[in-house]
């Protein structure tokens, strides 16, 4: 009887072993004895590997691209820019408000695309507008703010011939509200051609590419660190892209401006410098070197001083969290004082009504 029982248990054990080897055996059980569940979650690729293995030389990032530590906490990398592929190791540029959007890679959420964290608003004539907000800066235009950019369309289509404002016909009076704007609208039809977007671009042949570039826009701030931009195709792919640079016209400290000495018999001091060199600060990071830049000065009358001659330099910034990045910057060599003062970012500054 005992031999029969032993044989039965042995055969049952062998059968269970064979079934498991063939993959047809019973499901694994949990520690509590319940049948385990097979997970349907896809396996994600592991981008981080420890211990860390980093190249001996740090990567050289293009100007404007941050040098940061990767998401694994190991090596220095060039941060990914808007539209580039990112993952848990290849981080997006933190100094530009970017994050890795994994929404397209469902359900793995393994790789994403760098995108801006929040759609920023717009600033025009010292007034802040929210993203998507429609506003009317003057009677001629209606504008829309979209992620820091402003687009405007004319509210009127001028009629250059057959004007109903030339005189009343049949004893009827014309609408004086529209007639008062008609001289402005007539000039609007041609004056737009003087704006920067319609000017001929400077042309340069370089490496089989016809290089084109618009003029740099005025600095976004009259004091402190600002940004100016232009559109150019001076790149490896010869594609039209927006290029940005830092600009620093004047310090914002009013006490510094009070110390500027205007020569006797003069009403303006076009340029001035601080007594000692200082480091630039941008996005919470400071320049690796100290600089003594030339600033545009002040006038006793209503004139303002703007850069006249300048060159471009590259500034290296280091951050508290061991990251770093480079930016191109406007380096002023001389300034000129004029009565035609414009607010920074005024997109209508060159639209002249004659």
Curated annotation (Swiss-Prot):
> Outcome of altering residue 145 to Y?
In PPRD; uncertain significance
One of its GO biological process terms is: cell-cell signaling
What is the annotated signal peptide range for this record? 1-23
Note the SS bond partners.
48-72, 52-74, 54-75, 61-78, 86-100, 92-114, 268-305, 285-319, 296-335, 299-337, 304-341
Instruction: Please report the stretch or stretches of sequence annotated as the TSP type-1 domain.
Output: 208-253
Q: Where is the IGFBP N-terminal domain?
A: 44-117
The GO cellular component terms are:
extracellular matrix; extracellular space; mitochondrion
The protein's job, in short, is: Plays a role in mitochondrial electron transport and mitochondrial respiration. Through its regulation of the mitochondrial function may play a role in normal postnatal skeletal growth and cartilage homeostasis.
Q: Which disease is it linked to?
A: Progressive pseudorheumatoid dysplasia: An autosomal recessive disorder characterized by stiffness and swelling of joints, motor weakness and joint contractures. Signs and symptoms of the disease develop typically between three and eight years of age. This progressive disease is a primary disorder of articular cartilage with continued cartilage loss and destructive bone changes with aging.
* Family indicated by similarity: Belongs to the CCN family.
* The name this protein goes by in its record: Cellular communication network factor 6
The gene for this chain is CCN6
């Amino acid at each position: 009887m005992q031999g029969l029982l032993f044989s039965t248990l042995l055969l049952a054990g062998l059968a269970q072993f064979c079934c498991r080897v063939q993959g047809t055996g019973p499901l694994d059980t949990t520690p509590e004895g319940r049948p385990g569940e097979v997970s349907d979650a896809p396996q994600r690729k592991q981008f981080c590997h420890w211990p860390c293995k980093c190249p001996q030389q740090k990567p050289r990032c293009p100007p404007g691209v941050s040098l940061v530590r990767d998401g694994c906490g190991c090596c220095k990398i060039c941060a990914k820019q808007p539209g580039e592929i990112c993952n848990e190791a290849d981080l997006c540029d933190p100094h530009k408000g970017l994050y890795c959007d994994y929404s397209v890679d469902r359900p793995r959420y393994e790789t994403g695309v760098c995108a801006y964290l929040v759609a920023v608003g717009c600033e025009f004539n010292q007034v802040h507008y929210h993203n998507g907000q429609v506003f009317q800066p003057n009677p001629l235009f209606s504008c829309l703010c979209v992620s820091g950019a402003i687009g405007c369309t004319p509210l009127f289509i001028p009629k250059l011939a057959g004007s109903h404002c030339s005189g009343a016909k049949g004893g009827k009076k014309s609408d004086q509200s529209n007639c008062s704007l008609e001289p402005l609208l007539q000039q609007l039809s041609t004056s737009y051609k003087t704006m920067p977007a319609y000017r001929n671009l400077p042309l340069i042949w370089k490496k089989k590419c016809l290089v084109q570039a618009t003029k740099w826009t005025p600095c976004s701030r009259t004091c402190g660190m600002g940004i100016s931009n232009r559109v150019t195709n001076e790149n490896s792919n010869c594609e039209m892209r927006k290029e940005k640079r830092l600009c620093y016209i004047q310090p914002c400290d009013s006490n510094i401006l009070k110390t500027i000495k205007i020569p006797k018999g003069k009403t303006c001091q076009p340029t001035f410098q601080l007594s000692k060199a200082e480091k630039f600060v941008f996005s919470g990071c400071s320049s690796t070197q100290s600089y003594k830049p030339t600033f545009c000065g002040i006038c006793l009358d209503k004139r303002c001083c703007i850069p006249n001659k300048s060159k471009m330099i590259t500034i290296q910034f280091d951050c508290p969290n061991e990251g770093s990045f480079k930016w191109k910057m406007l380096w002023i060599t001389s300034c000129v004082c004029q009565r035609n003062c414009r607010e920074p970012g005024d997109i209508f500054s060159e639209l002249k009504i004659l």
